[in-house]
Amino acid sequence: MEITLTDIEKEAYKDSPVHRLDSRVKLLATILIIIFAVSLPRVHEDNLIRLAVVELYLVILMALASLNPAYIIVRFLAVLPFGLGIIVIQPFVRQPFFDSFTVYPLDLPFGLTITYEGLTFGITLLAKFIVCISAIILLSSATKMHDIVGAARQLGIPKEIALLLTMMVRYLFLFWSVLKRIRTAQKCRLFNIWNKKVHRKWILEQIGYTISSIFIMAYEQGERTYISMLCRGYGQNGNMKINKKDLKIPDILFSGTTVLVIVGSYILS
């Protein structure tokens, strides 16, 4: 299953109790969950219980949002290698914040040893990583990208950063569209990056040409976009239009429930 930017935006346009929540509330809840997960002790016997409670809460929210399970799994697996590379080496590393280590009696090659403390720390890192990624996937899947930027602007981020985020979101879709056209043209010419019958150097040259073409097209598009913005009155004092809404009862209930889950998971464990 292939997930594209368009698929992400389609999920965000669904109608569910989670989708109808105020974007500011969802953004703050995501930030709060990430801060909670990151701020937990490096190693503690109750860490996994606390994180499991929060993860269960996120899974329930995903179910209420009617998100496609296959879509969630594919997005999660796409990000997993970035954190897994750091997590896997932890059992073999002696972290400086431990005073002593308990070595497992395993005969490993290259003189490697696995410590109980390193393994515990690695498992804790994995649990934190899963919770943080789940929160981000839920936010991006249940909230339109423009609404996320608008919520961040209302919460006080500088307008310059909000403008950059807005432009980045637009250019992501433009970049994907350009890349698809280039890939379609290459396929029509029977170009296959994994073709073993073609010299690898030639394939790398074609990849370099593709990257160069995208860079030049992005530069030209940026110039055209900037000129269009100036023609529409863009300047130093320009502001981003934000549709301000008052918080409703579901938003308040969601905020309270999120805080209760986080505080409860910490106190009861």
Where are these regions (language model features)?
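Alpha-helical transmembrane segments and their membrane-interface exit regions
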Residues: 56-64, 80-85
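Transmembrane alpha-helix interface motif
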Residues: 1-43, 52-57, 177-269
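Short, hydrophobic transmembrane alpha-helix segments
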Residues: 36-47, 64-71
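Hydrophobic transmembrane alpha-helix segments characteristic of membrane transport
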Residues: 53-60, 146-151
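Alpha-helical transmembrane segments and their helix-start/interface "positive-inside/aromatic belt" motifs
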Residues: 69-81, 251-255
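Juxtamembrane/interface alpha-helical elements of multi-pass membrane proteins
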Residues: 75-197
